Amino acid sequence: MKTDIEIAQSVALKPIAEIVEQVGIGFDDIELYGKYKAKLSFDKIEAVRSQKVGKLILVTAINPTPAGEGKSTMSIGLADALNKIGKKTMIALREPSLGPVMGIKGGAAGGGYAQVLPMEDINLHFTGDMHAITTANNALSALLDNHIHQGNELDIDQRRVIWKRVVDLNDRALRQVIVGLGSPVNGIPREDGFDITVASEIMAILCLATDLSDLKKRLSNIVVAYSRDRKPIYVKDLKIEGALTLILKDAIKPNLVQTIYGTPALVHGGPFANIAHGCNSVLATSTALRLADYVVTEAGFGADLGAEKFLDIKTPNLPTSPDAIVIVATLRALKMHGGVSKEDLSQENVEAVKRGFTNLERHVNNMRQYGVPVVVAINQFTADTESEIATLKTLCSNIDVAVELASVWEDGADGGLELAQTVANVIETQSSNYKRLYNDADTIEEKIKKIVTKIYGGNKVHFGPKAQIQLKEFSDNGWDKMPICMAKTQYSFSDNPNLLGAPTDFDITVREFVPKTGAGFIVALTGDVLTMPGLPKKPAALNMDVLEDGTAIGLF
């Protein structure tokens, strides 16, 4: 069987200018990056703002196994299948981070016959958005350190600089560093650190901004440090929001590519869902909704992370809310949640499916709290048995949720036709009555308690010593009315990655808060979640190479 990259390289791509004609985008509306990639112009984005808004489908998943459950693959396959049954559809996805591509994932543009192309470009440098975000982030760091070095007019306490540098790689050695060493001409020595680019607040801002002026306003509101009298220092105090916006003026434009089946795709922005809000850009999703009748988008990791943040953080910034939520599940993941070891997942185990179903059931019930119709998509693997499939279908029927098998990795659009028809029928026959989980007026503690008890199924929330101090500080600064972005392990409903299934009788501890005042949310750090990942013992990079003719190999 061909690998993902072999399948991708076997496809005869059409020029992107030809692909986007089907959704009313002309040649003058795009800025080409070669023949097969383009950015959408500001003029076109503005021109469609008054157009009718289409139907929005959010794809999410159960708590994943370390290998992932094929959520991006399912999103792409579903969109291709919707187009095949006559629904004018676009996809709005995140763009991959190079760190995980070189680390454990080896690629993140879908898989099999459900991919966005050109996958090598998308997985590597694409149109340079990650570079622009990295540059803007580090320009801010350089200008901040220069301000301190050149007299420190704002009286910044260098011990309380909270802005970190970033790089789009998994590099644990950079988590904690000291800058300014050597001599006085090298600046003021201070502790610093690096995050991965997708954890940068500038990434979150780019993905939530609605236009250039909104981008500039959000950048100006970033808190970078505190003064010696404990007052927050903002980017606007440094007077550099204009320069940062300039660096990002092209990166904010959504990227256009295509699927194997020629479905137009907007791939733009890529914050992680365990340490950030996990959704592609508002600008890409909003624009797609005005160009197509149906838009398929996804949120990172499981529904407890990405979907919750999509619904509580991103949706209020969109012109509409989801009309349906598709929860992707695999039998192997359900068996793992049912207590089966990774080595034994290929063996039939109906009882483990029953035990692990509690994880899927909780996610279904959680999404229903938002008032949105739910469909379960079973991502089919060759090791799945008829007995396991029948058991899962019966369990889904018992909780009155629509369920369909899909084999889009192997069969492309044809493998998702039943799923597409079911999703379309649900949208046409059931109304969505979206409501947020919490209100802006709720306190930080109240918002987190609602997430922990209503979504995670936990009992109590404990706040560590630093978090308790920050609660008062954030309230005094007027930051307590913003949404909450939980930073938590993706593998469990709890903050313990080993607590699988649908655990109960557990507490969540928030150890620290990070104000993301430009993005407009507060990050609550739990467990051992890190904002700079490390590489595994055998990184995916070990299998990558390039042939003499420039052909990439080993990208999954």
Swiss-Prot record:
GO term, biological process aspect, one: tetrahydrofolate interconversion
Superkingdom assignment: Bacteria
InterPro entries the UniProt entry points to: Formate_THF_ligase, Formate_THF_ligase_CS, P-loop_NTPase
Keyword ATP-binding: yes
Residues that hold ATP according to the record: T65, P66, A67, G68, E69, G70, K71, S72
Pfam families per record: FTHFS
CDD domains according to UniProt: FTHFS
Gene Ontology molecular function terms on file: ATP binding; formate-tetrahydrofolate ligase activity
Keywords, in A-Z order: ATP-binding, Ligase, Nucleotide-binding, One-carbon metabolism
EC number: 6.3.4.3
Pathway(s) where this gene product acts: One-carbon metabolism; tetrahydrofolate interconversion
Reactions catalysed according to its record: (6S)-5,6,7,8-tetrahydrofolate + formate + ATP = (6R)-10-formyltetrahydrofolate + ADP + phosphate
Keyword Protein biosynthesis: no
Disulphide-bridged cysteine pairs: none
Family: Belongs to the formate--tetrahydrofolate ligase family.
Name this polypeptide is given: Formate--tetrahydrofolate ligase
Organism this protein belongs to: Streptococcus agalactiae serotype Ia (strain ATCC 27591 / A909 / CDC SS700)
Taxonomic lineage: Bacteria, Bacillati, Bacillota, Bacilli, Lactobacillales
